[in-house]
Swiss-Prot record:
Cited Pfam families: DALR_1 (PF05746), tRNA_synt_2f (PF02092)
GO cellular component: cytosol
Catalytic activity, as annotated: tRNA(Gly) + glycine + ATP = glycyl-tRNA(Gly) + AMP + diphosphate
Assigned keywords, A-Z: Aminoacyl-tRNA synthetase, ATP-binding, Cytoplasm, Ligase, Nucleotide-binding, Protein biosynthesis
Name of the gene this protein is made from: glyS
Protein family: Belongs to the class-II aminoacyl-tRNA synthetase family.
UniProt KW Nucleotide-binding keyword: yes
Name the UniProt record assigns to this protein: Glycine--tRNA ligase beta subunit
Xref: PANTHER family: GLYCINE--TRNA LIGASE, CHLOROPLASTIC_MITOCHONDRIAL 2, GLYCYL-TRNA SYNTHETASE
Localization of this protein: Cytoplasm
Single Gene Ontology MF annotation: glycine-tRNA ligase activity
């Protein structure tokens, strides 16, 4: 009869950021190891709090499935003597396998016959397998950072304090260092005392709840959000949903209780982003807003415990937040006394990168590159682009951004507005960092778009030119994110821009620096890197992999043109004339792929079908060229598909690979001319 398995790893408080990943890994490792152990099971669940990781596997089979072991022995020619009797080698193999020679089988492997011993191995009881299996699962868990404790060698995210393991109604016995698995657990650190005996899996969940532990993280999240909404509503406001904060708080507490706190309205003079950053990033509070979306002088915090002495908890949290907001107000007032130009003057004292100069050097590069991109795209006014680039890094010298680095750009916009800079300049200063993370908004103003592209292209070129590029999971300079941001901006804004030209210009910005790589190598590597991101974007947008391969195989440095062409190819693939199109392509491509010349000696052509086809080529080539310039890819594709009848007639009437070399060359020239029209759109040999 199948039984449930429960494992609880009791630990010191785990970092909340580790929890989602480790619970997923725990589930995956359990499923993988159970399958490898030939133990069938039902649903696998992982639950967790800061102090415990729980694995619950339903309906594990009582014993392993039986298995067949196949061991290969000597060749048949060696296993038998000349008279067909078992040789010493054959008998020795049977003896080593513990089977009678007559039970051996003869099987062919790669044309050679061998002896095989087929043995049935009976599965072991699950309770014999599980101790080693659970040990393996626990030791296989990995973390961003791990530690040892006491004098032990085991590494884990935090010290392991207890282990509970139950299979059905029995303990699963194993130990890690001096910690032995048992049938007891512990409740809430402050609201429960002593050991809690667990007699069954059902009993485990009941006991924890009675001792102030809500084990299911999904239930805790739901409780927290309901309480936060209720508390904020009672204070006359509302909390904005923040999934990331909600998940983090859920993994900080075992028994959540929300409370409302207040701060002085005078702090509302500080930009709201500063206040919410203090509340969310530093204190894990939920800011409270009125119905118009304006920040109120209050917050909702979540306590790890009951409502006992909640007023004292509230007062303590208000004191901590007040200290932070007092600092923020001071920074705001101090920074507001300086202009952005004063701050910008200090950039010469700060390194952008030890091998790429100072931030002041970077600003000069951005000014030149922004002008160049503005000319390429027709976006922005030169003087405003220059001004935006000059001031875009100035807020890095402010007290506020030094204290709150995540507010770079945001504070720059406020300081620019306070310094009477034009609105377009202030907006570009903020937007040049966009997008900052996956799913973030893209820049929308002309200056913001240009400066954001310049920022990312300069960063990418600088890193690639000194040999810094992502490898595996390592990407310390977030180059993948910046490249993807660049791609998304270009596609979203439908910008036609020659990336090769702009990257070459970006390289020139580093002309006074001793770079590791040449301009040609740097630009080539960067374009390859960008098109790897482009490939992912195309696939994510529903373009089939073969169409993506076909479109990307034709060199183009215009990302939007490539995207639009791939989209039209995908659309055309569903067209009723697509079959005609591919027939024409395959017939001309297969014969002409090794032929280079489009030269055709008209005097050598003898059949009307080849003369007719040849006469159509100049007009067709001109029409295809015009269609590609106009990016009317559908028309170009349909024109080529319309050649089906002419191509069929051509191949019916003439033989291309004739003995007459000059005639063969003329006919291959016709086919190559047609093939090259296909190749000017995409590499259709990739289509499946």
């Amino acid at each position: 009869m199948a039984q449930d398995l429960l494992l609880e790893i009791g630990v010191e408080e785990m970092p909340s950021a580790y929890m989602p990943r480790v619970l997923k890994d725990l589930k995956d490792l359990a499923q993988k190891n159970l399958a490898e152990a030939r133990l069938s099971c039902g649903e696998v669940l992982t639950l967790g709090t800061p102090r415990r990781l729980c694995l619950w596997v339903k309906e594990i089979s009582e014993e392993q499935e039986d298995s067949l072991l196949e061991n290969r022995g000597p060749k048949k020619s060696i296993a038998f003597d000349a008279n067909g009797n078992p040789s010493k080698a054959g008998l020795g193999f049977a003896r080593s396998q513990g089977v009678d020679f007559r039970e051996l089988q003869i099987r062919e492997v790669s044309g050679v016959e061998y002896l095989f011993a087929i043995k049935k191995e009976k599965g072991q009881a699950a309770e014999q397998i599980l101790p080693g299996l659970l040990l393996k699962v626990i030791h296989s868990l990995s973390f961003p950072k791990s530690m040892t404790w006491s004098y032990y060698q085991t590494r884990f995210a935090r010290p392991i304090r207890w282990l509970l393991a139950i299979f059905g109604d029995k303990n699963v016995e194993f130990n890690i260092e001096n910690i032995k698995s048992a049938n007891y657990t512990y409740g809430h650190r402050f609201l429960s005392t002593g050991v809690l005996l667990v007699t069954s899996i059902d009993d485990y969940f009941r006991v924890l709840r009675e001792h102030y532990v809500i084990l299911d993280q999904a239930e805790r999240k739901k409780m927290i959000w309901q309480q936060v909404q209720k508390v904020a509503g009672e204070a006359g406001g509302k909390a904005m949903e923040n999934e990331e904060l909600l998940e983090e708080v859920a993994f900080l507490v075992e028994f959540p209780t929300a409370f409302y706190g207040e701060f002085s309205p005078s702090y509302l003079d500080v930009p709201p982003e500063v206040l919410t950053t203090s509340m969310i990033e530093h204190q894990r509070y939920f800011p409270v807003y009125n119905n118009e979306g304006r920040l109120l002088p209050g917050f909702v915090g979540v306590r790890n415990g009951t409502d006992y002495c909640l007023d004292i908890v509230r007062a303590g949290n208000e004191r901590v937040l007040k200290a932070r907001l007092e600092d923020a107000l001071f920074f705001w007032n101090e920074d507001s006394r300086k202009s952005l130009e004063e701050m910008s003057a200090k950039l010469k004292n700060v390194l952008f990168h030890e091998r790429l100069g100072t931030l002041a050097d970077k600003v000069l590069r951005l000014q030149k590159l922004a002008l160049f991109i503005g000319q390429q795209t027709g976006l922005g006014q030169p003087e405003k682009l220059q001004r935006s680039a000059l001031l875009c890094k100035a807020d890095l010298m402010s007290n506020m951004v030094y204290e709150f680095p995540e507010l770079q750009g945001i504070m720059g916009r406020y300081y620019a507005s306070g310094s009477a800079e034009e609105p377009e300049v202030a907006e570009a200063i903020f937007e040049h960092y966009l997008p900052r993370f996956a799913g973030d908004k893209l820049p929308s103003s002309a200056g913001g778009i240009v400066l954001s592209l310049a920022e990312k292209m300069d960063n990418l070129m600088g890193c690639f030119s000194i040999g810094i590029k992502p490898s595996g999971s390592q990407d310390p300079y977030a180059l993948r994110r910046q490249a993807l941001g660049l791609v998304n901006i270009i596609l979203d804004k439908k910008l036609s821009i020659d990336l090769k030209l702009v990257f070459e210009q970006a390289y020139l910005g580093y002309k006074d620096i001793d770079l590791e790589k040449s301009r040609e190598d740097s630009v080539k590597e960067l374009l390859d890197f960008i098109y790897q991101r482009m490939r992912g974007v195309l696939l994510d947008n529903g373009i089939s992999y073969d169409v993506v391969d076909a479109a990307l195989s034709r060199p183009s440095f215009d990302l939007f043109e490539t995207y639009y062409r791939a989209f039209k190819l995908q659309e055309f693939k569903k067209s009723p004339v697509f079959e005609d199109f591919m027939v024409v392509y395959n017939r001309v491509h297969n014969l002409s792929r090794k032929w280079e010349s489009e030269e055709i000696d008209l005097d050598l052509l003898v059949d009307e079908s080849e003369k007719n086809l040849c006469q159509k080529l100049p007009g067709l080539q001109e029409d295809i060229k015009k269609s590609l310039i106009a990016q009317d890819y559908t028309r170009a594709l349909e024109l080529l598909a319309a050649l089906r009848a002419d191509i069929d007639q051509f191949f019916t009437a003439v033989m291309v690979m004739v003995d007459d070399e000059r005639l063969k060359a003329a006919r291959l020239g016709i086919l190559k001319s047609i093939a090259n029209m296909f190749n000017s759109i995409a590499d259709f040999s990739k289509i499946v």
